Amino acid sequence: MWMHKKILLKLSGESLKGESSYGIDPRTIKKIAWEIKEIKDLGVKIAIIVGAGNLWRGRTGEELGMDRSQADYMGMLGTIMNSLALQDALEQTNTITRVMTAFPVSSVAEPYIRRKAIRHLEKDRVVILGAGAGSPYFSTDTAAALRAAELNIDVILMAKNNIEGVYNKDPKKHQDAVLIKHMKHQQILSQRLAVMDITAASLCLENNIDILVFNMLKKGNIKKVVLKEGNIGTVISSKGE
């Protein structure tokens, strides 16, 4: 079977809130867990990074006049909360998981150690990576690119909410926006497209890591992108094809 065999799934925090305005929606996180289990049962090695936008937004810190580092650490703690929630949802599907965090939270998770994370993947455990990159000023997109490089991941699957992929302009503001099916990493940098931040895009370019941006809210899309079916989303690669 032709498929991606080792993936990093990047979930936004918003993907966990479903139709709610805040927090974690039980039905949504269970649905995501079952879709992850489905690809896990195909033999795919899976690492996951979750954002925290459902619990904390950087702009809230700005509105409060908070120090940027303080606000970023709050976001990192939010990703740990989401990681634990996703771990529980996955384990309800009888999927073996490990949560590893970029800074120690020893009561609830393992510290991130590269060689240990690789070993967990080799043992077919789903590895959920919390606390982003562990330092302020680095987004969870950058953390995803960093961990993908460290763990020799084939592709980063960037799951979006009701957005089919990368467009030539904002589809929420422009009805004539066109979906781009294939592009190069360099286009993100040169055109400053809002796919991921520049640091993350640069890391992917330097380490030749492919990115696939897709709409995760359509049932079965995670499996389809893993199996390379249906020509879904936008593929970003060094070749642009």
Swiss-Prot record:
This is Uridylate kinase. Its main location: cytoplasm. Keywords: ATP-binding, Cytoplasm, Kinase, Nucleotide-binding, Pyrimidine biosynthesis, Transferase. Transmembrane segments: none annotated. Homohexamer. Belongs to the UMP kinase family. InterPro entries: AceGlu_kinase-like_sf (IPR036393), Asp/Glu/Uridylate_kinase (IPR001048), Uridylate_kinase (IPR011817), Uridylate_kinase_bac (IPR015963). It catalyses: UMP + ATP = UDP + ADP. Pathway: Pyrimidine metabolism; CTP biosynthesis via de novo pathway; UDP from UMP (UMPK route): step 1/1. It comes from Onion yellows phytoplasma (strain OY-M). GO terms for molecular function: ATP binding; UMP kinase activity. The gene is pyrH. It is found in: Cytoplasm. It comes from the Bacteria.
